Amino acid sequence: MPACEPATRSIEHCGGMVYWIGGWRKTRRQSSQNQVPAMTNAASMTSSDTPSKLPTNTLHGVIAAVATAVGEHGEPDSARSTALARFLLETGCDGLNVLGTTGEATSFSLDQRRRVMTAYAEAGLPLDRMMVGTGAAAVADAIALTKHAAELGFAGALVLPPFYYKGVHDDGLVAYIDAIVTATAAQPVSIYLYHFPAQSGLHWHVALIRRLLDTFGERIVGLKDSSGDMAYARDAASILPRFKVFPSTEAALPEARSGPFAGCISATANLNADLCARAYRSGDAAALAEAVTIRKLFDGKALVPGIKALLAHIHDAPPWARVEPPLSTFAAADRAAVIAGYDAVRAKRVA
């Protein structure tokens, strides 16, 4: 391989609202039987296509899969979203995953996703501490979003496989990544694979990850694993020392401190970032237990609507409960149960 205690609440104003705040490509191996044709060649590249140096990537630790606020008419509420992002970074998160599943990315249009990304930049947030979801069913959309991420300065692009067709050959998934890598060679951005087969229906399986690393070198930086299969996550983390794997649960944080993982990317870190930070930075077992207890409140419930319902409660901001179709508002009984459970955890003092 070539070298190639819960946060103190205060008030924050944003947009008039008051918040309560508590190429790099390796030469292809011709002997590999599943290789796909290269989409570009050196002779066809212009000076503007000349590969640039990949920025240093330091994403690690507690990363919240940050929610995206939705406005009254179904549009992304960027002001409210960036206020939450700032709050999470100030109260424990090492980084953020913008426009992932919790951020309802695939329910927004290409233009809406680009506008949210731009809003993060215009808010002066540290994009070098953030990866942003750029995967799409259409490769042209994935390219456009990944280019925008690179232009704005995000630390990484989190790439879902193209999720409509099921049972596709590995060659098709390699071609998808090839198109993104080739189109962003002049201004590269680190690529993180997003493994969520329950939603996408497709797997970034270990043999395929090895192939992508062999083909595209250091452009492929890591993996977010939302499969819940810790054996798979450990296998993926063992491929290369530099390949960063982030399971989607806080329960993996002890293994991020001294084991195979680079951290976690969690939806419930929207709600328990301070506890996760203690668990990760100082090995605080009590804080980890409280963080996991909060996560388990959502077992058997609709996670994204539930996260947003609890954000509405925590920040005393009812608009946070809005979700984008096809999701629907969290059921009232579930909301009451989750709020009661969360408040009970927060009533305890974590040493």
Identify the function of each model-found stretch.
Residues 10, 31-32, 44-48:
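Serine residues within intrinsically disordered or low-complexity segments
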Residues 183-187, 196-302:
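Catalytic alpha/beta core domains of metabolic enzymes, predominantly
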Residues 50-51, 63-67, 91, 260-261, ...:
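C-terminal alpha-helical cap/extension of soluble enzyme domains
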Residues 51-201:
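Active-site beta->alpha loop and helix N-cap motifs at the rims of alpha/beta catalytic domains
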Residues 12-13, 19, 30-35:
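Low-complexity, intrinsically disordered or signal/transmembrane-proximal segments
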